[in-house]
Structures are given as C-alpha cells and as structure tokens.
Amino acid sequence: MRRGRAGRALLAALGLGLGLALGGGAAQAQAPLSACPSLPPRSPMPRDATPDYLAEPTWRSRVAELDRQIAANDMARAQMVFLGDSLVQGWFPSIYQQFYAHRGAANLGVGGDFTQGLLARLQRGHWPASLKPRLAVLLVGTNNIQYGGQPADIALGIAEVVRFIRSQSPQTRILILGLLPRGDNAAEPMRRNITQVNALIARCADQQHVFYAEPGPLLLDGQGRLSRDIAFDGLHLTMVGYALLSAGIEPQIRQILAMP
C-alpha cells in the first residue's frame, strides 16, 4: 500500500494509535543537574550548546509573539509544553487540538530554532518560574544539522536543554523526540547525521524523568522513502504526517502522564 493511502487510512481511525517502544536504560533516581550524564558539558562548549539569541528576524518576531503570550497567560495552568522549531510550531492545528488541547498543552515552538536559540529563549523568559508542567516534549536540532552542526555537538545542545528544564522544574518529565528524517530517500546525506544524533540523545533516557521516542521510522515506507504525502518538502509535515507523528508518540505520552 502506498504511504499516502496508509496515512489517509490512519486519519480515518486515529483512535487506534501506534505503538512505539520507549528508549533508554534502567530507571534510576536523578538530580536535576545530572540529567543526560552520557553527554556531559565540555570546555569550551560548542556553539550548538551555548545559548545564542539568534539574529534572524522571523525567529525574533515569533519569539516576541511568544513573549507576549506567556506574559498574558497563566503558565501555571499548562500541563504539557511542546518545545522546538518549525516542526513544533507548525503542528497541524486540528491534529494538535485532537491530541493535546484537552491536556492543557502549550506550544512554544519557534520556526527556525536551533538548539542554542532554544536555550537562549528558555533562559530569557520562555520557561517562566510559574511553568511546572507534568510533561515537556522536545523536538529540536534539525536546523543545526542543515547548517553543518556536528552530531555530538547537537546532541550536547539537546542535553543542555534537558538539564535546564530539570533545573527549573525537577518534577517535569521530559520526552525527547528523535530528529525526524529529511529528504526523499535513504541516500539523503543528512540522514546519517540524524541517525548519529538520535543514537546519542537516546542515551539520555532514564525511564523515570527523561524518556526518548523515535517516531521517524513511522513516516517512512519500507525502502526508507519519505513521501510528499507525509512531508511536503522532505522535512515539514502535512496533516497526514502530523497524524502519524501524534499517534506514534501517544502511547508514551499516556504512559508518562499516568506515572505518579
């Protein structure tokens, strides 16, 4: 069956969901600043792991918009928060509404974000003191890949985001999503770096505070191809793509939210 048909069939029966194994090692207690011990800070820290308030005008415009929204809302009411780049900001509205609106989710995605940009804006107010969600979902790093970031540096940037969240809200559990596939087929050069980043960040999962999911394979056919029915430009998802993504991570989200 063509992936496009499979996606449409899924849309007709979203309630079924898709299973996806949780990554990581054995559960263990974890202090906030010991998150992601397999990716410790380095000296000097690479650019991808150093907070940087990006200069790109569109990014700054969206950041300013979020500044206003955060100031105008009671962020203590947010039970879930989504953090990341355009793949988060652009979560298809009807799919987002179906899966997350009833959970009090806040979308803090910013198109064009990098790991270092996310770190900077979290430190500058996008994680206010009142924000204590039960779950933070993190998807960031694909722009670092596109602009030549090295897998180990990008993974460290993601780990720094995790450590920041843990330091601000130790009770918040974090679901790291593996970077999604890019390009039409498995020969796309960036896929190798994506695989390397995902292998590194998967090791952050401790199954108690930090969790990992890799929904990317759900978007591909048996030959590793990414249909334009799923990602209209080889990266950004269509409604069908977001349906697959949301259904794919739903079992983990339910499991995490059910934890005491």
Predicted features and spans:
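Catalytic His-Asp segment of secreted/periplasmic serine-dependent ester chemistry enzymes
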Residues: 181-260
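N-terminal/domain-start segments enriched in small and hydrophobic, helix-friendly residues
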Residues: 55-58, 75-78, 116-152, 237-260
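N-terminal secretory targeting modules
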Residues: 1-82, 88-94, 98, 255-260
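Acidic/histidine-rich helix-loop elements
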Residues: 47-56, 107-117, 146, 234
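Structural recognition of the beta-strand scaffold that forms the well-ordered cores
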Residues: 79-82, 104-109, 135-140, 144, ...
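Extracellular/periplasmic catalytic domains that process cell-envelope and extracellular macromolecules
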Residues: 73-77, 98-100, 128-132, 167-169, ...
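Extracytoplasmic/secreted proteins, especially bacterial periplasmic and envelope-associated proteins
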Residues: 82, 113, 117, 149, ...
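Oxyanion-hole/transition-state-stabilizing segment in secreted/luminal serine hydrolases
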Residues: 89-101, 116-159, 164, 175, ...
